[in-house]
């Protein structure tokens, strides 16, 4: 892994500033070609890992493929799936499919999106309920499990409970 990772929030239109900014970003990067040029510039400096919501932004995978074709270099894909964490058999099947889709896209690392993981957090017991089930699904799909985290407790509880998490 490189020390620097390409983050795709801005590229995908998640400015966290305003709807107008988000629309401007999506308009600027409405094709895989414009996104590919960004990836190619990073690859020029051996920054070869990309983190994003590949199931949400349909330009990311084609842009990865274009950048790889144009540079002859491979990008490490770190996918942040949105998974259904409801405690039902149907939700688990839906989550499993979302995780398997990450593997099909070629992700090496799968980090369920923070908004999903945070729903499982129990501050009283200092646990992340059912997290081991999702981490096992990630391993079964052949990827390295990680967690997207905006809350410090996600990292703290995962480490404290020795969950099978390799990166944050």
List each model region and its residues.
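N-terminal binding-site loop/beta-alpha segment at the start of enzyme catalytic domains
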Residues: 1-69
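Hydrophobic faces of well-ordered beta-strands that scaffold small-molecule active sites
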Residues: 2-8, 50-52, 75-80, 110-112, ...
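Short charge-dense sequence patches
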Residues: 9-13, 43-49, 79-90, 146-147
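Active-site mouth loops of central-metabolism enzymes
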Residues: 16-34, 78-93, 121-123
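Alpha-helix-loop-beta-strand connector modules within alpha/beta enzyme cores
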Residues: 29-36, 57-85, 128-143
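Acidic (Asp/Glu)-rich catalytic clusters
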Residues: 40-44, 61-75, 96-107, 159-163
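An acidic- and aromatic-residue-enriched active-site/binding cleft used to recognize and process polar
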Residues: 55, 82, 150-152
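Glycine/proline-rich, positively charged
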Residues: 86-168
């Amino acid at each position: 892994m490189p020390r620097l990772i390409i983050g795709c929030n801005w590229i995908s239109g998640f400015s966290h500033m305003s709807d107008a900014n988000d629309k401007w970003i999506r308009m600027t990067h409405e094709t895989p070609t414009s996104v590919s040029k960004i990836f190619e510039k990073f690859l020029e400096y051996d920054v070869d890992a990309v983190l994003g919501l590949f199931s949400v932004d349909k330009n990311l995978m084609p842009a990865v493929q274009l950048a790889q074709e144009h540079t002859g270099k491979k990008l490490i894909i770190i996918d942040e799936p949105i998974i259904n964490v409801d405690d039902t058999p149907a939700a688990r099947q839906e989550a499993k499919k979302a995780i398997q889709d990450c593997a099909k896209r070629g992700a090496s690392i799968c980090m369920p999106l923070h908004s999903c993981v945070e729903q499982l957090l129990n501050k009283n017991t200092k646990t992340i309920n059912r997290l081991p089930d999702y981490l096992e699904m990630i391993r079964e799909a052949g990827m390295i499990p990680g967690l997207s985290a905006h809350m410090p407790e996600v990292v703290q509880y995962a480490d404290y409970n020795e969950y099978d998490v390799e990166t944050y």
